[in-house]
Amino acid sequence: MISVMQQMINNDSPEDSKESITSVQQTPFFWPSAAAAIPSIQGESRSERESETGSSPQLAPSSTGMVMPGTAGMYGFGPSRMPTANEFGMMMNPVYTDFYQNPLASTGWYSYGQPYQFTANYSIPSLDGNLSDITIPTTAGSSAATTPNAAMHLPWAISHDGKKKRQPYKKDQISRLEYEYSVNQYLTNKRRSELSAQLMLDEKQVKVWFQNRRMKDKKLRQRHSGPFPHGAPVTPCIERLIN
């Protein structure tokens, strides 16, 4: 290209310049294609791979056809002996390989002593003894303290003998209470104390009797009145029947 330009400069005639220009236009320019560069790259990588394989030691494949470079000379098995499950897990785990390859790793472990042992004098109390030896503290008001075999009672088997029993009213007491109820359904504190003294009852018993009597009357009124205590509602059908 430079020679063509020099000829153009040296030529004085326009015809020579035209011929040189046409010759320059007709000469094609070619760049190296990617297809031509690929074989050279493949050849270089192949030569590098061959040089690496030639410098590295060759490992004999195992019976299964697998070659493990990290396990050569580290475990006691070879083509004639298959690794166990624990050994295979140690091979595949990089933590174990780093530990065994490092000679100072085993010196960093602390050796612990035997686990704690129970003392020889310690004994568990047995429950095979007689239950009569077990004593349960009781209060002064409980009935278990008065019984001869109070020590045999257990917390879940304490009797309820100390509970006050219900005392029924006598006929003369009921008749007098009914008379007082017919006169007045609610007693004052003074009248309640007088009535309890006359009937030889506690004021609480008189109060409870009047409460139960009022509840009984309420239930009787509800039973007689039905679901409509203020009377049945008047419907158009009932109005026609009345008229």
UniProtKB/Swiss-Prot annotation:
GO terms for molecular function: DNA-binding transcription factor activity, RNA polymerase II-specific; sequence-specific DNA binding. GO terms for biological process: anterior/posterior pattern specification; embryonic body morphogenesis; embryonic pattern specification; nematode male tail tip morphogenesis; positive regulation of miRNA transcription; positive regulation of nematode male tail tip morphogenesis; programmed cell death; regulation of asymmetric cell division. It comes from the Eukaryota. Residues 1-23, 40-67 are annotated as: Disordered. GO terms for cellular component: nucleus. The keyword Transcription applies. InterPro entries: HD, HD_metazoa, Homeobox_CS, Homeodomain-like_sf, HXA10/ABDB-like. Residues 162-221 bind DNA. Interacts with nuclear receptor nhr-25. Interacts with geminin homolog gmn-1. Interacts with homeodomain protein ceh-20. This is Homeobox protein nob-1. It comes from Caenorhabditis elegans.
